[in-house]
């Protein structure tokens, strides 16, 4: 399977640089997995698509202000993008500089360059940085960090992004990108879903900067997925198993919820799904046998990205690419601040041959 099989033409004008004024007023393209049928509507139509007893699984990670600017004490400018917080003093980060810092290099971070840190070690493409400050890492990031807007949102971050680029239910700090399907849920919609008897469960997957890395191989099977930390607690497992037992559906809100649940299912020893706490490198592409998810809420993803591959494995390649073609024709807004899809599972997707 070739990466170019997942390419599509996207006019620049369809990339959303700001969210809709009202979270739940975005457009919703519904794709019926088994047939490929498409329906156009608005996000609140989701209420009519779910049944009492269905379980929505959200990712409750919270985006940290992960982008830092500064310089080496010796002079050269640097940009630091936190990949993950290791503890209260140390981070693992990508560093952009004219010359990569060596272990022991002193860094002056923040717009005022008044936060002192040291690059202590290198781990492949990532740098371990230790802050020489009494405050915990998260407090430092909240004080001097910028929101890490994705590279395709071509503007500086603004104060408003600190809330707009978070889900309303975000709770556990650690992500450097928002689980964007969740951005469309506002408090009134969540209340209406509860009122209807829709159950809600929360996993945690701290989205890493690797989510924006392009696939740099020609053949999909050669791609090595980045690693991210995920938690699927016992109460989520219980909710999933109970829903399956009574004939209800499990609906993942976002690809990060998919990857969390499917990681927990892959690692399970005796049941369909068991609690999972750890790093996952799960890479879902056509041919993958889904184990847990019955439907998916997701945004529109980048051409040739691992996320459009995940969607293709769920809905079927032809159905997915047709839906994207229709979305472009109908001028849906794309990517993190864009519109959404509601997709039901296509059990025939696993048998589809891509690029033959």
Curated annotation (Swiss-Prot):
Catalytic reactions of this protein: 7-aminomethyl-7-carbaguanosine(34) in tRNA + S-adenosyl-L-methionine = epoxyqueuosine(34) in tRNA + adenine + L-methionine + 2 H(+)
Enzyme class: transferase
MF (Gene Ontology): S-adenosylmethionine:tRNA ribosyltransferase-isomerase activity
Pathway(s) served: tRNA modification; tRNA-queuosine biosynthesis
EC number: 2.4.99.17
A GO BP entry: tRNA wobble guanine modification
Compartments it resides in: Cytoplasm
Keyword set includes Metal-binding: no
Record field: transmembrane: none
PANTHER family per the UniProt record, alphabetical: S-ADENOSYLMETHIONINE:TRNA RIBOSYLTRANSFERASE-ISOMERASE
Subunit structure: Monomer.
Function in brief: Transfers and isomerizes the ribose moiety from AdoMet to the 7-aminomethyl group of 7-deazaguanine (preQ1-tRNA) to give epoxyqueuosine (oQ-tRNA).
Family of this protein: Belongs to the QueA family.
Protein name (Swiss-Prot/TrEMBL): S-adenosylmethionine:tRNA ribosyltransferase-isomerase
């Amino acid at each position: 399977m070739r990466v170019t099989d997942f390419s599509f033409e996207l006019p620049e004008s369809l990339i959303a640089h700001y969210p809709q004024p009202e979270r739940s007023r975005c457009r919703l393209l519904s794709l019926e997995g088994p047939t490929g049928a498409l329906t156009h509507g608005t996000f609140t139509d989701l209420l009519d698509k779910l049944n009492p007893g269905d379980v929505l699984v959200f990712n409750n990670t919270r985006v940290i202000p992960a982008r830092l600017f500064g310089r080496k004490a010796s002079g050269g400018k640097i940009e630091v993008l936190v990949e993950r917080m290791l503890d209260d003093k140390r981070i693992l980060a990508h560093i952009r500089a004219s010359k990569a810092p060596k272990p022991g290099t002193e860094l002056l971070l923040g717009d005022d360059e008044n936060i002192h840190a040291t690059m202590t070690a290198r781990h492949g493409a990532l740098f371990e940085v230790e802050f020489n400050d009494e405050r915990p890492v998260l407090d430092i990031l909240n004080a001097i960090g910028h929101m890490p807007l994705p590279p395709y949102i071509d503007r500086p971050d603004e104060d408003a992004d600190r809330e707009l680029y978070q889900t309303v239910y975000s709770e556990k700090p650690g992500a450097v990108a928002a689980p964007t399907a969740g951005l469309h849920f506002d408090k009134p919609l969540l209340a209406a879903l509860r009122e209807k008897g829709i159950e809600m469960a929360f996993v945690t997957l701290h989205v890493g900067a690797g989510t924006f890395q392009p696939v740099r191989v020609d053949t999909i099977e050669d791609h090595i997925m980045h690693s991210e930390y995920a938690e699927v607690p016992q109460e989520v497992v219980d909710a999933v198993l109970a829903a399956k037992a009574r004939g209800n559906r499990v609906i993942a809100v976002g690809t990060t919820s998919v990857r969390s649940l499917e990681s927990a299912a892959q690692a399970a020893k005796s049941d369909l799904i068991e609690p999972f706490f750890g790093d996952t490198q799960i890479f879902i592409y056509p041919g993958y046998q889904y184990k847990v998810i019955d439907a998916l809420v997701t945004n529109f993803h980048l051409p040739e990205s691992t996320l459009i591959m995940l969607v293709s494995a769920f809905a079927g390649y032809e159905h997915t690419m047709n839906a994207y073609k229709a979305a472009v024709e109908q001028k849906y807004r794309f990517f993190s601040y864009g519109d959404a899809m509601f997709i039901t599972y296509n059990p025939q997707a696993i048998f589809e041959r891509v690029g033959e």
